[in-house]
């Protein structure tokens, strides 16, 4: 299994002195980050679509083995809720495709008040088939059933598992040959991290994307580093 491990975002000036060198210019942060981690979850794409030149510059700062995971536009997931979003989705995937082999999955995080609608998700996944690997993070409890799992399996899309203090993780379920896990707590003991590593490996995915939460204290880079250390043991 190949682990792609990182943090939600990288351009955090609060990390200077704890993760980044104190005097590191912001323009050098991505290259420095990519020396330590194999993936990054880009959340600002939720609110704003980056330009072609910005995305091209990202690819020039990281190795070919690095992966960018883009969070889908809020227009698609929150405002229009996967309906009548052909233009917005096409525009988003066109930008994502600039990443080429460095393109990871696209994270579709649905709002907490968006209740189960399998036919809507199925129609949306059909519309993007073959253009992107999709991970879905459902935040209303009505989504967690066999019908939804079967839908994701048919479309070879991942059920994103998110773990936080407010909402502990559901079980890891294999719906594709790759998985997506968001570890959102500020603290994880070695015991907890080992448990996650074991659970992820038991799903026998080809690839596992694992992202830690951004904290001003730079807890995310520390936890991601420790996760990688334990995964190598």
What do these predicted ranges mean?
Residues 1-233:
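Residues lining hydrophobic/aromatic ligand-binding pockets adjacent to catalytic sites
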